[in-house]
Amino acid sequence: MGRVIVVGAGVVGLTCAVRLLEAGHRVDVVARDLPLETTSSVAAAVWSPYSHPQQHVVRWARAAYDTFAALCDDDTSGVVMRTGTELFREEGGDVWWREALPPGAGPDRETSLPPGYASGLTMRTPVVEMPVYLGWLSGRVHQLGGSVTRLNLSALPAGDALVVNASGIGSRLLGGDPSVVPVRGQVVLVEQVGIDHWWIDAATPAYVVPRSRDVVLGGTAIEGEWSRTPDPAVARTILERAAEIEPRLAGARILRHKVGLRPARPAVRLEREGDVIHCYGHGGCGVTVSWGCADDVVALADG
């Protein structure tokens, strides 16, 4: 098979590279930002579908769920299964992506809710510790014979190779797509205080996602904002909201503040255009749909 150049070393680009390598392609990943410098490294990364087109998101998310569930058997992957609850301010809140969950994973009605919430859906989903997982993905690329190289591009590569454009927000320039906009997300990492249940507010960017050594508290979703500098006032609000959801977080030691720019678009772009396969615009849903999207990229490459 021919050579493929994947542009972008976030979770989508690396996952596409792994699937292409597994399918027998020769793959080189090039990116301005290496994996731990990408927005993907900031993600709390609890499997939780959203974005459009919904019918594809459900399919992509289910494929990713199944792959992540299998990766839980690998202690080096950074993937674990955790039970958590999506919270609603109104009675009878529901999710449109129920069918993306496998049998037995939920969602089930939750009766023990934080103050201010009228209903909740509890389910068992993958939670991905991104600094560990991005290292695992990079290692898998190299193990399969691929490479990951820092390269600052002003345009997509031209030549005989097939190109996969997984450049995220970089697709404004590289893909000539002004519909891709940044959605600023700020998080606070605090010490792990014995929490193993995740919480997501369905109506706001507030969430509490426990990991092995810390807890990720979010967040914000400010469209069109490019600043990567943490805002102390926003951090205080994040901490206050998190403590309302999970009181054990009150006074937890702060470890780090982080900001990422989600690459949002009215709908994910996953299509082939000549010798370029575009796969970007996932917003904050990149981890959740990553393996399903990568499967479609391979199908387009082989088709």
Enumerate the language-model features and the residues they cover.
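N-terminal Rossmann-like FAD-binding beta1-loop-alpha1 element of flavoenzymes
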Residues: 3-28
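Glycine-rich FAD pyrophosphate-binding loop
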Residues: 22-40
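Central beta-strand plus flanking loop segment that forms part of the substrate or channel wall
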Residues: 44-49, 82-88, 171-200, 239-249, ...
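Short beta-strand to alpha-helix junction loop
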Residues: 55-63, 120-136, 229-234, 289
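Flavin (FAD/FMN) cofactor-binding and adjacent substrate-gating region
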Residues: 66-144, 265
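Flavin (FAD/FMN) cofactor-binding core of flavoprotein oxidoreductases
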Residues: 82-83, 87-93, 239-302
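A conserved short coil-to-beta-strand element within the FAD-binding core of flavoproteins
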Residues: 146-159
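Flavin-binding catalytic cores
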Residues: 195, 212-214, 222-261
